[in-house]
Structures are given as structure tokens and as C-alpha cells.
């Protein structure tokens, strides 16, 4: 049925939405795709007056851009920087900018980088910036770079940019407390629901637990650890679709599976993936093995399960005490201690803190994104909350308030916590609302962008960043739609 509906609606899209003009639009010859980047905390704009005595203004900024791969020459990887938009953060000054340009990275001996941008800041047009060739300040795909404004400059207002950017993939998470979105008619979001940073509820707690055989009326059992397995990583027979693996926040009884513990790893397909005893078995904790809980779950670079527990314990095999903040591997080794995860941060508290490890995601490179259970004050970043996403590179990837902003909670809380975290580059690029499938809501996004035709920015459906949503993008959308049918 979905196939037939798709064929019909594609025809309607061509004629009713874009009109006959779309039949003469050419496809972009470069089939490369754009990667969305996000300007994170640490990005700043400097507003300086070189001939007067006013203070130099250091303005925190946030924003995003698209990094488009271009040709690779013998020495450099070259990229286009598309649709870089930023706004100021804070109540004192209002700045906004829109820039575009190029970025290259490489070198013959040492690895260097260069970014060139041009555009508008606060209505001032024709601004140009150049970093020149400078050493890397961060390991790619992170980008950290300083850009100076090129002459001619206005001595009364000269700008400089410091950009800290990270590739911003699909991010799912859960909170520690429930909240009410501000959208009219929105229902309360549970601390057991799985959410997307786009402001969507990916999966309610009842949808996650619906096949576990819990006696109705099924209560909300919370959501602690979470991960999403795509088919390329999980090829279990009889499981044709991806599964969400998760842990609950309390014990409950299943009529089909028996007792379910908060330390068990469960599947929305209706099975126990690992019991709490299975997960810690190779660490040889002192018997009898209690339920230590399950706080974080993710896959390591080698495909093995990594996890953290809610309680520490002593490993007879390793001869050490395991902290509730350590990231453990199911093969019986410590992947990273909480000390290693926080090594590049600088807590200023005079007393030891039990940080804990509430959520974690490990990139193929080994970089870890994570959240902790206790707030602390850092000498560089200030207060770090238990709902912030941190990187073991020593950066704050996203504040809890930024994650919740698309929902607009009406509750006045500084931090809603972060219990579960899953990060992945979307398997289906046309999954614009990041709910795990391509459906009519994504189709509506495509149709809306198509009406713009020859757009001046790169909307999500402009897969190849050629500034228009045309048949090349429609082909990719169709492939994603039909792939979601299989």
C-alpha cells in the first residue's frame, strides 16, 4: 500500500506542488552529501573598536552550518561551508550572522586547516573572514578555528570569529523527570519516553514495553539506558526491523518473561537481551551477584556492549573496585574509568564527587559522549549539569536546556536530567523528524521545501546542497521511502 501511495503522491508533487517549472530544473552534477554541523559552547564573536576606548565585546554565539565535501587534491581535503547561521546567546547584546565559504584540511608535513567566509553580520554586508593556514585545534571531524576580518574594515566595528563545531547527527535521549511541552494540545512527556532533539517523541514508554508481557494496565517503568540497533549491526534471525534496547528504572513482573529487573537489558521486541547477571558475569563480582542496576548502554568501536551500573562493586577478576561512573565492557574489562572520561575537564570542587555515569555513546573513533549524575563547577565551562551532554575531549556538546528547547517545557527547571542517550547518523537521510522512519511527515517537509524552489539556503531535503530541492533530492527521498518499506 505504501508503495502505491508513494507513486501517486510523487506524481501529484511534481504537478501540484512545484508546477511545470520543476520539469526543466537540472540535477546537480555533484552527488555529494552535506553534513550538518552545530556551533557549540565556546564559539564566540568579537566586536572590537580599534580607534576608540570602548571595551572589546566577546559575544557567545550558537548556530549551525552544512559542510559539503568537494574535490580532494594531493594535499588537502576541500569542503564548502554552506548556510552558516549564528545568533548571540545572552540578554545583553543581539547579534546574528549569515556566512558561507570554504574549509580545507591537510598538508604536506603537518596537518593544517583554513577557513574562508563571507557574508552578513547584523545587516553589515560584504564582510570577509580568513583564518589563513593554521594548525588544527581539534581532531577532525571536530572543527575549532579562529577567523580574522579582512580589510577594508570599519575601525569602529571590526569582527573576529572563534568557531567550535561538531557534526550534529540524530540524537535521541530521555530525561530524569517528566515535563509538559508548551505546544497547544501537547500531552505530558514521561521520563520513560524516548525523545529526539528535533522536538519529537520517538517512542512512548508504553510503546517500548508493549511486547514485554507486562500485565495491563501497563505502568510507566521509566527509561534509563537506551540504544538503537540498526540491521547492519544486528542480524538476528526473525528480527527484520531495528530494535530499541533499554533498561527500566524499576523492577516489574512479566507474564511471559518472569521478573524484569532494573539492571536487565530489555528489547522493545519483547525479550530480555541480557540479565543483570549476564552483564557483570565476566567481572566476577563477589557472589551472590546482586542487581547493580543499568545506567548506560552503548556499543564500543569493536561492536561489544559497553555499560555502566547504578552501584559500584568489587571485581574479583580484576582485583579492583568498579565505580558507578566507569564504562565497562561485557568482555570483563574497563573501557574507560570516570576519571579518564573527565580527565580534560577541571572540576574546582575541593571535595571528591561521586560523578556517576548516566548515559554514554561511543563513536567509532573511541570518543565518548556522556552525561553524569552529579552537577559540578568547571574552571573553564562553569556549572556543568547532570543533563548536559559532555565529550571526553573536554567539551560541552549540548546543554540540557538546548536539548529541551524544541519542546519548550512549561516547568521552570534548570535541568531535566539526561538518563538515556543514543547518537547515530540517520540510516534514512529522508527521516527529517528523526523518528526512525520515513513517512508522510517527512514527505510534508520535502513538499514544503519544494515549493520554495531555487532556495537561498540548504533545507534538510536539499541532500546535495545545490540550493534547490529537485529531482536529485526526490530520487534520494524515494530510495529512503522504499527502503523503509522493506
Language-model regions, residue ranges each:
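Bacterial N-terminal signal peptides that target proteins for export
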Residues: 1-10
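N-terminal segment immediately downstream of the Sec signal-peptide cleavage site
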Residues: 28-74, 168-177
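Predominantly extracellular/secreted and cell-surface proteins with exposed
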Residues: 50-161
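Cellulosome-associated attachment modules in secreted, modular CAZymes
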Residues: 170-189, 245-271, 286, 306-322, ...
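Surface-exposed loop and turn segments in beta-propeller and other repeat-based domains
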Residues: 200-218, 270-289, 332-351, 395-424
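Signature of short aromatic-glycine-proline-rich micro-motifs recurring in repeat-based ectodomains
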Residues: 217-233, 288-298, 350-362, 412-425
Amino acid at each position: 500500500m505504501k508503495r502505491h501511495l508513494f507513486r501517486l503522491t510523487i506524481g501529484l508533487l511534481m504537478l501540484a506542488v512545484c508546477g511545470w517549472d520543476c520539469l526543466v530544473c537540472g540535477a546537480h552534477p555533484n552527488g555529494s552529501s552535506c553534513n550538518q554541523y552545530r556551533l557549540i559552547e565556546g564559539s564566540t564573536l568579537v566586536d572590537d573598536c580599534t580607534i576608540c576606548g570602548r571595551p572589546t565585546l566577546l559575544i557567545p554565539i550558537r548556530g549551525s552550518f552544512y559542510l559539503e565535501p568537494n574535490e580532494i587534491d594531493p594535499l588537502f581535503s576541500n569542503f564548502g561551508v554552506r548556510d552558516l547561521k549564528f545568533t548571540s546567546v545572552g540578554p545583553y547584546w543581539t547579534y546574528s550572522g549569515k556566512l558561507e565559504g570554504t574549509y580545507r584540511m591537510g598538508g604536506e608535513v603537518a596537518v593544517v586547516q583554513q577557513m574562508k567566509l563571507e557574508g552578513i553580520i547584523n545587516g553589515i554586508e560584504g564582510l570577509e573572514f580568513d583564518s589563513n593556514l593554521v594548525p588544527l585545534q581539534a581532531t577532525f571531524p571536530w572543527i575549532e578555528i579562529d577567523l580574522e576580518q579582512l580589510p577594508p574594515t570599519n575601525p569602529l566595528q571590526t569582527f573576529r570569529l572563534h568557531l567550535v563545531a561538531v557534526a550534529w547527527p540524530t540524537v535521541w535521549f530521555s530525561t530524569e523527570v517528566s515535563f509538559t511541552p508548551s505546544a497547544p494540545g501537547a500531552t505530558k512527556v514521561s521520563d520513560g519516553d524516548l525523545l529526539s532533539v528535533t522536538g519529537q517523541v520517538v517512542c512512548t514508554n508504553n510503546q517500548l514495553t508493549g511486547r514485554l508481557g507486562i500485565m495491563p494496565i501497563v505502568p510507566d517503568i521509566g527509561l534509563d539506558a537506551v540504544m538503537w540497533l540498526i540491521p547492519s549491526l544486528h542480524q538476528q534471525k526473525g528480527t527484520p526491523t531495528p530494535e530499541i534496547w533499554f533498561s527500566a528504572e524499576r523492577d516489574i513482573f512479566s507474564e511471559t518473561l518472569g521478573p524484569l529487573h532494573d539492571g536487565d537489558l530489555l528489547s522493545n521486541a519483547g525479550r530480555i537481551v541480557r540479565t543483570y547477571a549476564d552483564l557483570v558475569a565476566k567481572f566476577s563480582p563477589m557472589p551472590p551477584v546482586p542487581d547493580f542496576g543499568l545506567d548506560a548502554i552503548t556499543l564500543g568501536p569493536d561492536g561489544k556492549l559497553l555499560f555502566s551500573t547504578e552501584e559500584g562493586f568489587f571485581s574479583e577478576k580484576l582485583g579492583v573496585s568498579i565505580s558507578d561512573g566507569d564504562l565497562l565492557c561485557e568482555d570483563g574489562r574497563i573501557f574507560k574509568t570516570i576519571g579518564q572520561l573527565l580527565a580534560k575537564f577541571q572540576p574546582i570542587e575541593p571535595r571528591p564527587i561521586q560523578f556517576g555515569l548516566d548515559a554514554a555513546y561511543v563513536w567509532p573513533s573511541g570518543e565518548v559522549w556522556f552525561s553524569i549524575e552529579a552537577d559540578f563547577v568547571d574552571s573553564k565551562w562553569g556549572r556543568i549539569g547532570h543533563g548536559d551532554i559532555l565529550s571526553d575531549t573536554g567539551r560541552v556538546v549540548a546543554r540540557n536546556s538546548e536539548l529541551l528547547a524544541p519542546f519548550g517545557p512549561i516547568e521552570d527547571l534548570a535541568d531535566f536530567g539526561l538518563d538515556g542517550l543514543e547518537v547515530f547518523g540517520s540510516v534514512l537521510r529522508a527521516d527529517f523528524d528523526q523518528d526512525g522512519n520515513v513517512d508522510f511527515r517527512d514527505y510534508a517537509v520535502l513538499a514544503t521545501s519544494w515549493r520554495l524552489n531555487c532556495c537561498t539556503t540548504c533545507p534538510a531535503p536539499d541532500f546535495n546542497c545545490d540550493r534547490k530541492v529537485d529531482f536529485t533530492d526526490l530520487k534520494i527521498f524515494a530510495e529512503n521511502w522504499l527502503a523503509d518499506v522493506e
